[in-house]
Every structure is written in C-alpha cells, then in structure tokens.
Amino acid sequence: MIEIGENVLLEYIEENELKKAKSKAVSIENNELLIAYPVDVVTGRTVILHNDMEVTVEFVGKDEVPYRFISRIKGKVKDKLQMICLEMPPREKMKRIQRRQYVRTDAVLDVQIQPGNEEEIRTLSYNISAGGIAVVLADGLSFQSGESLRLIIRLPEEEHTRQIETEAVVRRIFNDPKSEKRKMTLEYSEIAAGDQQALLQYCIRRQLNKRRKARME
C-alpha cells in the first residue's frame, strides 16, 4: 500500500491540541512501518512522539488514492538514520479518504487555465483543497459545467514555488454578490499523487496558522 519514500502525514493530540507532522516512509516489514523523524507542518521543527502514543496516518497509495489509518508509536529505531516505528494495520483497516474530506482553505494563488487549443488564461484562486480549486473569472470568459480544462497552479512551498499541472472538470459557475465577481469551481480529474499530497499539506498549514492567529487575538 505505502511505497518506500512516500510522504506520510501524522495527526496526534498533544496538550489537548491537534498537531500535524510530515515524514517519509523508510521501511515496511513485519506489520511495522518505519518513518523518518517527523517535522511539524507549521514550524518545520522535529517533533517528539512518545511510545504508545496514538496517531492517525495519512498517505497516498500505489493506486494514487489517499488512505488513512489509526496507529500507535512502538518506539525508536537507530540504523543509518533515526526512525520511528509505527504499528501497520492490515489493508482492510485502512480507510479511503473521500474527496469531501479534503481540507479546504482560502488562498490567492496564480493559476493558468488552458482550454483546449485556445490561448491560456491567467487568473487567481480564492479557495483551494487537495480535491479541487475555486477561481475568479474575468468578464467575457465562458465555460460550461462538465467541461475539462488543464490547470497550472503555482503553489508556494518552504524553499521554492511548486508548479502543479492537473486536469480539472468545471463543476459550477456563479456570480458572487459580495465581491461582485464571477467565480468558477473545479474538481481535479487527473493529478499526480505527489502534487495532491503537497496541496493537502499546504491547506493544513494554512488552517493551523489561521487557528493559532485566532487564539492569539
């Protein structure tokens, strides 16, 4: 199910607060998953996970479908690098993550729309998730619900900007009375597993930052 080197996302409770950390799968054997030391998705700092701590693990499988399962920390393993050992449940204990479960966040990102053989259109997103995106439409642009478009999304990461290319299907076009702008929502139909994982981690980071800022106000 999990490929070696695949990104994994961990959720756990610490001091009554939901925390999220990212890591990579290093080895799988004897119903155990070994991962590199995880780092907090917001601070980028290495996190300490105690033995017997319950964690939720999310990953994108070989079939490019996202999955989730509940696990426990079994301990630390020292080899060429330090690793964390997790319980690995059987496949039937892993749950597929449905598209509606993707974390969604407000975000203004540069987006290029490529409608068939026509000239590309540059616009901005206002909302995004690992399952789809919502963009602003300039006056005069017209698309149909169900139409397939190619998108290029510029996603800011810690050290560089990631360019995500994906096929997407138009789901809805509407007029927003608050902004007085036309908007369009799209669902990704073809997207690389690594790009989808990057989008998921980006949305989670923004949500956690938003919550922390709200608590400080």
Swiss-Prot record:
> InterPro entries attached here?
PilZ_domain, T3SS_YcgR_PilZN
- Pfam families assigned: PilZ, PilZNR
Could you tell me which residue ranges the PilZ domain spans? 98-203
- MF (Gene Ontology): cyclic-di-GMP binding
| Name this polypeptide is given | Uncharacterized protein YpfA
Q: Which organism is it from?
A: Bacillus subtilis (strain 168)
